[in-house]
């Protein structure tokens, strides 16, 4: 299973989230998932909201275009980005 793939015009990502990091960043591969560090704590959905905002900024889409499909309450997530305007190089290199 790939960490990133296209499905029609959408981009799907399998992510491993590291909350409470010192800065937001795409760390690299973590097994078969893409590891993303975010500064938000994993409390009351703050990490998910922050992750959506961060990915939306990277892909130049609205926050509502980033959908957590699986893993709402865990570190392992599957995220769909609807019609991304831009795909960061770190992610583009992983697309199958």
Swiss-Prot record:
It comes from the Bacteria. InterPro entries: DUF167, YggU-like_sf. SMART domains: DUF167. Pfam families: DUF167. GO terms for cellular component: cytoplasm. Signal peptide: none annotated. Belongs to the UPF0235 family. This is UPF0235 protein VC_0458. It comes from Vibrio cholerae serotype O1 (strain ATCC 39315 / El Tor Inaba N16961).
């Amino acid at each position: 299973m790939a960490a990133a793939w296209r499905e029609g015009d959408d981009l799907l990502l399998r992510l491993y989230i590291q909350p409470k990091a010192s800065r937001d960043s795409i760390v690299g591969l973590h097994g078969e998932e893409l590891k993303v560090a975010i500064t938000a704590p994993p409390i009351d959905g703050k990490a998910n909201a922050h992750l959506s905002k961060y990915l939306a900024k990277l892909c130049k889409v609205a926050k509502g275009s980033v959908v957590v499909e699986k893993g709402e309450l865990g570190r392992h997530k599957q995220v769909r980005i609807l019609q991304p305007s831009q795909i960061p190089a770190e992610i583009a290199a992983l697309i199958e």
